[in-house]
Amino acid sequence: GFYQVVPVEYKRGEPKESDVDILQLTAQAMCLEEMMCCEIPVGYLFYGETRHRTKVDITDGMRAKVREIFCEMHQYFEKRYTPRVKRTKSCNACSLKDMCLPVLGEDKTAKAYIEKMLDEK
């Protein structure tokens, strides 16, 4: 065709040491490929903090890693299990921080919850 689909993921901060941003971009590319019946070999990550755009090759290895994560998520869903999440300093910059479940599950036991409630009064 006349057009090529190229996903660009905008991030507020700066590049991370882990591959989470690349995995997110890869997952988006995979969804777009299915929706638009096309191949997406490349995408970009734009970081607001550094005002820099980084080219990302959408490789078979990254696609396989995304599929592996999808399978793991589906297994959790089938078991009706929600894994615990550890809050980190990056949680404060997350767009979902006000709706996030880890805050709800911070008290590990009923006893800890009751003690916390009594201490607040």
What are these regions (language model features)?
Residues 1-15, 27-30, 94:
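Conserved catalytic cores of phosphodiester-cleaving nucleases, focusing on short active-site segments
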Residues 24:
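Catalytic-loop motifs flanking and including active-site residues across diverse enzymes
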Residues 33-121:
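Metal-dependent nuclease catalytic regions and adjoining charged, substrate-binding loops involved
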